[in-house]
């Protein structure tokens, strides 16, 4: 495989996807009340946000905080509060699939990743949501194919990998701390597993393996959207922190600013 370049620092272990918008936090829970204060662009962008509702919230983030446990009390939103008021049924993506061999948790974990145009953060999928997503992609469960414990581990790996991806992005964004002191937020993301980046193809021509996945993350840098490309490479066994992949994270060549960032970091690496 070979070493991969990641942020202005070094390549870091991590992997795949995230989730997004919430409803209200569990009653009495002190979390999610902090706001990103001191950002000079908050007031400046509020008009634009109200005018265009620029960043549409994904459906899987709707009422997401109904399923997030309070880190202080361990309390979760009451079951009744987690039901669709129109039919008193849980949201479809939290409903067990027909012939599902075992029950799966519907609890969701709040990420550390700020959501654009919101004081809230992205919320990761539950075990049940992940299972249903795999079914929608054509996967079918077979005897002893995946266990209840496996699904728990899959979610832990998924969440940890996204946290590491965001840390890598923050290292790049540190180059722009002067223009965006409040830090970036995540607008949207998407998987492009078979759309190999030019960098990944060049590595392949040199004899290294292709990444097993690719994501593009669009972040909001205080009013400016910036695209990051993330290539995921197999890093061996899963460690105790649920990391097993090596990430190659970098801003896409979409602007002169991104090209300049890449050139600066390449020079630093070459001369360090």
From Swiss-Prot:
Q: What is this protein called?
A: Holocytochrome c-type synthase
- Alphabetically list the UniProt keywords: Heme, Iron, Lipoprotein, Lyase, Membrane, Metal-binding, Mitochondrion, Mitochondrion inner membrane, Myristate, Repeat
Q: Which reaction does it catalyse?
A: holo-[cytochrome c] = apo-[cytochrome c] + heme b
Pro residues bias: start-end ranges: 88-99
GO CC terms of this entry: cytosol; mitochondrial inner membrane; mitochondrion
Q: What is its main location?
A: mitochondrion
Q: Where would you find the membrane-spanning parts of this chain? A: none
Membrane topology according to the record: Lipid-anchor
User: Which residues carry the N-myristoyl glycine lipidation?
Assistant: 2
Per the record, which residues fall in region Disordered? Answer: 1-62, 76-116
Q: Does the keyword Lipoprotein apply?
A: yes
| Record's keyword annotation contains Thylakoid | no
Write the Enzyme Commission number(s) for this entry: 4.4.1.17
Per UniProt, what is one Pfam family of this protein? Cyto_heme_lyase
| Localization, UniProt | Mitochondrion inner membrane; Membrane
Instruction: Write out the function statement from the record.
Output: Lyase that catalyzes the covalent linking of the heme group to the cytochrome C apoprotein to produce the mature functional cytochrome.
What GO MF annotations does this protein's record show?
Answer: heme binding; holocytochrome-c synthase activity; metal ion binding
């Amino acid at each position: 495989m070979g070493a991969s370049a990641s942020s202005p620092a070094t390549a870091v272990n991590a992997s795949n996807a995230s989730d997004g918008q919430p409803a209200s936090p569990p009653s009495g829970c002190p979390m999610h009340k902090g706001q990103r204060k001191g950002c000079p662009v908050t007031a400046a962008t509020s008009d634009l946000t109200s005018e265009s509702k620029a960043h549409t919230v994904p459906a899987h983030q709707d009422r997401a905080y109904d399923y997030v446990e309070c880190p202080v009390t361990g309390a979760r939103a009451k079951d009744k509060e987690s039901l669709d008021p129109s039919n008193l049924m849980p949201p479809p993506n939290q409903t067990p699939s027909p012939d599902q061999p075992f029950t799966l948790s519907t609890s969701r974990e709040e990420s550390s990743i700020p959501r654009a145009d919101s004081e809230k953060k992205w919320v990761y999928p539950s075990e049940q949501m992940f299972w249903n997503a795999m079914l929608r992609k054509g996967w079918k469960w077979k005897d002893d194919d995946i266990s209840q414990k496996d699904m728990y581990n899959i979610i832990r790996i998924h969440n940890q990998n996204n946290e590491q991806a965001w840390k890598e992005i923050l290292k790049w964004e540190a180059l722009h701390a002067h223009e965006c002191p409040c830090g970036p937020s995540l607008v949207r993301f998407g998987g492009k597993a078979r759309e190999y980046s030019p960098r990944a193809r060049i590595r392949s021509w040199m004899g290294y393996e292709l990444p097993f996945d690719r994501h593009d993350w669009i972040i909001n840098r205080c009013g400016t959207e910036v695209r990051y490309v993330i290539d995921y490479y197999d890093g061996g066994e899963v460690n105790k922190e649920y990391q097993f992949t090596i990430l190659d994270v970098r801003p896409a060549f979409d602007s002169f600013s991104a090209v300049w960032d890449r050139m600066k970091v390449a020079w630093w690496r070459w001369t360090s």
